Structure formats: structure tokens, C-alpha cells
A protein has these predicted regions:
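Alpha/propeptide regions of enzymes that mature by internal proteolysis
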Residues: 1-322
Length: 322
């Protein structure tokens, strides 16, 4: 098994667009020929678009783009730009008079980071597609990762800056990768060592406050629980699977969330994972699902380690006590 770039998986294009001043952005994953896709949502507050298409009983067997965006529900407007871009290129489901691109989307909540009135819109979605054709994807404070933060159980005063991350591996001809925007209520753990590497800081910002311990300190209802969270990501593979199998792989990839984010899948998160099939390699579903959890954990680490301090929030690179 060797490590590769997420951009080494053929059949997709990935692009970022962002507004650094406004503190938000979006990241698009495009397939010109269509990609079979599954979805597993574990968080209690998702902001999403066209998720019904991905159910096994839905007629469409492939879609043309997955968009990961900021702006919460407001940011769902960005999919219109993706649709416009793909329609102009003649990509989509042929309905005779035109081709209708099938675009699914999930968004994070980043409205409290910089300018609450700056959100991904149709123009930004279009720019992300242009970026995909320029191969402009990178990890860190870009695309949907622009406004990502973590460790928000006590609100924004003690949280840290996060971003978008990716990780991919190859075994023989099989390629499996993950891309993820880490915007969690909880803290981020290094799944190798079991130690917190980013998350909620104490009042002196000299150590981690440990969200799980704070949560366990009282079983009474936490009225102050911050609701602006969500970790959204995608597994991308060149193996051939149907929607049911891909939904299973997406579900197994959530094990990567559970290893690396604590607490995770709360009512204050909208945690979601897509699984995309963009090839014809024959592979075992359970093997790929197990591998999906591994690459997702690594992608989460990449997201926090590549983040830069911004908007007054410290990043992993700034911490002196780790």
C-alpha cells in the first residue's frame, strides 16, 4: 500500500473557491461521465441538497457533482453555479431539450467566523468548477475549509481554526481516498496516539480543555451547547460499486470520524459522508469500507495540520504545548 494524492484518482476533478474576507468557501468534486454515489448522514442537523437521489430506490444511478460548502443552508445556492457550469459543458442527464446536471451538496455552519452575510452563492459554485479544471485543490484554509473551526462546545471564544484535508492510498490497481471539511463541535484526536491535537482550548489557551470531560461533568441538559457545527466529507474510489454498497462504505467511513473526533455525531452536528465510485476495479465492499475509515482518519488529521490561524483563531501550527 502506498500513499497517493487525492488528485491521482482518475475520473474526477476537484476545485476550490473561497472568499477569504468573508470567511467562507466551497469545494466541488466533478465527474464528466457521472459517478455512482452513496450517502450516510449521522449528525442531527444537516444542511443538504438532492440527498434523495442517492437512495438505492431512486431512479438515478449516477450524479455529476458533489459540492461541499459553507454558509449553512444559505450556501446551498452555490449548487446553481455548478449546474450552470456543467450544463454549458454539455454534462448532465439528457432530457432531450438540454442536459440536467445532478448535483448533491452538504454544507457546514461558518456564519460566525467572519461576515455572516457572505455565503457561497451561484458565482462561487461556478468558480469552484473553474478551479477544478485548473486542478487548484489544496488542503487547509481553502474552499469549504476557509471558515472551518473546531472545539466549539463553549462557543467560538475557545475554539481553533481547522480546514479541509485529504488522504489517499493505492493497493495494486485499487485507489481509495478521502476529502473532509472538519468543522466539529468536538476535539480532534490523533488516532495513532489517542492524544488530542486540536480542539477547545482552556481560558489561558495553554492547554486543551477536553470537550468530552466537560460534557461528562454534568448529565443535566446543556442549554449552552453551540449548534454551529458539521463535519462533511467524501470517500472516492476507482472500485465499482452500486448505491447500496456505497452507502455501506460511507457508513463504515464514519468509523474514521469516531476515531478522530470526540464527541461526534451529536445533535449539534450535521456529520455526513458521501462515497463516490469513479472506476471499474473489482473490489470487496467490506475491505474498501474498512480502508475508507482509515483514510478518513488521516484526512481529518491533514485538515487540522494544514490549517493556518485566521480570523483570530489559533491553528495546530501555533500550539506550543503539544
Amino acid at each position: 500500500m502506498k500513499t497517493i494524492s487525492i488528485k491521482d484518482i482518475e475520473g474526477i476533478r476537484i476545485g476550490n473557491a473561497q472568499n477569504f474576507t468573508g470567511g467562507t468557501g466551497c469545494t466541488v468534486i466533478l465527474s464528466e461521465t457521472g459517478m455512482c454515489t452513496g450517502l450516510d448522514v449521522r449528525g442531527g442537523g444537516p444542511a443538504s441538497r438532492e440527498s434523495e437521489l442517492l437512495k438505492p430506490l431512486a431512479a438515478a444511478q449516477s450524479i455529476h457533482a458533489v459540492l461541499l460548502g459553507g454558509g449553512s443552508a444559505f450556501g446551498l445556492d452555490a449548487a446553481g453555479g455548478v449546474m450552470q457550469f456543467l450544463e454549458e459543458k454539455g454534462i448532465g442527464f439528457d432530457v432531450g431539450v438540454t442536459k440536467v446536471p445532478l448535483v448533491c451538496q452538504s454544507d457546514i455552519f461558518d456564519l460566525t467566523v467572519a461576515d455572516a452575510h457572505t455565503r457561497p452563492d451561484k458565482a462561487m459554485g461556478y468558480e469552484a468548477c473553474k478551479g477544478a479544471y485548473k486542478n487548484n485543490y489544496q488542503d487547509g484554509n481553502f474552499g469549504v475549509g476557509t471558515g472551518a473551526t473546531i472545539g466549539k462546545f463553549r462557543g467560538m471564544d475557545y475554539c481553533m481554526k481547522s480546514g479541509i484535508g485529504s488522504y489517499a492510498v493505492q493497493i495494486g490497481e485499487l485507489k481509495v481516498g478521502a476529502i473532509v471539511a472538519v468543522n466539529a463541535l468536538g476535539d480532534i484526536y490523533d488516532h495513532h496516539s489517542g492524544r488530542i491535537v486540536a480542539g477547545m482550548l482552556n481560558e489561558e489557551r495553554s492547554a486543551f480543555a477536553d470537550t468530552a470531560k466537560l460534557l461528562y461533568s454534568s448529565y443535566e441538559v446543556h442549554d449552552n451547547k453551540f449548534v454551529g457545527n458539521t463535519t462533511i466529507g467524501a470517500i472516492i474510489t476507482n472500485a465499482r460499486f452500486d448505491k447500496s454498497q456505497l452507502s455501506k462504505i460511507a457508513g463504515m467511513a464514519h468509523n474514521g470520524y469516531a476515531r478522530s473526533i470526540r464527541p461526534v455525531h451529536t445533535s449539534a452536528d450535521g456529520d455526513s459522508i458521501y462515497a463516490l465510485s469513479v472506476g471499474n476495479i473489482a473490489a470487496d465492499c467490506d475491505m474498501v469500507g474498512t480502508l475508507a475509515a482509515d483514510v478518513m482518519s488521516e484526512a481529518i488529521l491533514s485538515a487540522v495540520k494544514n490549517a493556518e490561524s485566521a480570523y483570530g483563531y489559533l491553528a495546530y501550527k501555533d500550539l506550543k504545548f503539544i
